[in-house]
From Swiss-Prot:
<protein>
    <recommendedName>
        <fullName>Mlc titration factor A</fullName>
        <ecNumber>3.4.11.-</ecNumber>
    </recommendedName>
</protein>
<comment type="function">
    <text>Shows zinc-dependent metallopeptidase activity.</text>
</comment>
<dbReference type="InterPro" id="IPR042252">
    <property type="entry name" value="MtfA_N"/>
</dbReference>
<dbReference type="GO" id="GO:0004177">
    <property type="term" value="F:aminopeptidase activity"/>
</dbReference>
<dbReference type="InterPro" id="IPR057256">
    <property type="entry name" value="MtfA_enterob"/>
</dbReference>
<dbReference type="GO" id="GO:0006508">
    <property type="term" value="P:proteolysis"/>
</dbReference>
<feature type="binding site">
    <location>
        <position position="211"/>
    </location>
    <ligand>
        <name>Zn(2+)</name>
    </ligand>
</feature>
<feature type="binding site">
    <location>
        <position position="152"/>
    </location>
    <ligand>
        <name>Zn(2+)</name>
    </ligand>
</feature>
<dbReference type="Pfam" id="PF06167">
    <property type="entry name" value="Peptidase_M90"/>
</dbReference>
<comment type="similarity">
    <text>Belongs to the MtfA family.</text>
</comment>
<keyword id="KW-0862">Zinc</keyword>
<keyword id="KW-0963">Cytoplasm</keyword>
<keyword id="KW-0378">Hydrolase</keyword>
<comment type="subunit">
    <text>Interacts with Mlc.</text>
</comment>
<keyword id="KW-0031">Aminopeptidase</keyword>
<keyword id="KW-0645">Protease</keyword>
<keyword id="KW-0479">Metal-binding</keyword>
């Protein structure tokens, strides 16, 4: 287990970490100064309170540790740090890893097989990631392994099970389920027509509601323009849940850049 050397130190030492450089990635470029400062504070707390376990001789420098913490905290920027209390450890492999998976088919038969995984979110357990795919999570590609696994934890908060419906007001549940299932059907239909490789949204989202929520959370933060175009009503529901509007933030950033 790797214990960060600053875990027991105070915020003054947190300030010595390369936060400004860590924030300088495309995914975070549209944050306001106030949001960047708040995210930095959340990420510093994350590094102090979570145990990051580097496996198979993986090593991360201070900059990449900071960037990883920023990714973990982006989804809870306006929800609050306590939304990350569903886990205490993050296990990180250098590359995608092999697991012994067990699943039950529609006939009740249990199957066991070895599978390659990019990440996992264990119910009432750690988050497991791999550094190779984390490195593809800093841009605006629509892919973000960290946000995907954090979304599973947020989904399971309250009920204890990830089912595609995160903790929202009861009056919102019916509409949420309707719009999420409609998106799953559209994503699956597109994949059937053009093929998985050519689909605009990862077809994995069509596999079940929990994966749809996690995959669309990736697009919500890293490709909001695609999400809002394809599923405008569902996008607004995500805005209300996460208490953020990445598309609007991106528009404001583009306007500011154009003026400058």
């Amino acid at each position: 287990m790797i214990k960060w050397p600053w875990k027991s130190q105070n915020d003054a030492l947190d300030a010595g970490l390369p936060w400004q450089q860590a924030l300088d990635i495309p995914l975070l470029s549209s944050l306001s100064a106030a949001e960047s400062q708040e995210l930095r504070q959340l990420a510093a707390r994350f590094l102090r309170q979570k145990s990051l376990i580097l496996l198979q001789e993986l090593q991360l420098d201070r900059l990449n540790r900071c960037r990883l913490a920023l990714l973990f905290c982006l989804p809870v920027l306006h929800l609050g740090y306590e939304w990350l209390d569903g886990f205490h450890e993050v296990l990180i492999y250098p590359d995608p890893f092999v697991v012994d998976d067990e699943w039950q088919d529609e006939f009740g038969l249990v199957h066991r097989e070895r599978m390659v995984q990019a990440g996992q979110s264990w119910q009432q357990g750690p988050i497991v990631l791999n550094w190779l795919d984390i490195q593809d999570s800093f841009d605006r590609s629509g892919y973000n392994l960290v946000i995907h696994e954090v979304a599973h934890k947020l989904d399971a908060r309250g009920s204890g099970e990830a089912n595609g419906v995160p903790p929202i007001a009861l009056r919102e549940v019916t509409g949420w389920e309707r719009d999420l299932h409609a998106a799953m059907i559209q994503i699956g239909d597109e994949s059937d027509i053009v093929g998985a490789a050519a689909a605009s949204i990862d077809p994995y989202a069509a596999s079940d509601p929990a994966e749809c929520f996690a995959v669309l959370s990736e697009y919500f933060f890293s490709a909001p323009e695609l999400f809002i175009t394809r599923f405008p009503a569902l996008y607004q529901r995500f805005c209300r849940f996460y208490r953020q509007d990445p598309w609007q933030r991106l528009q404001q950033d583009n306007t500011t850049s154009a003026v400058q």
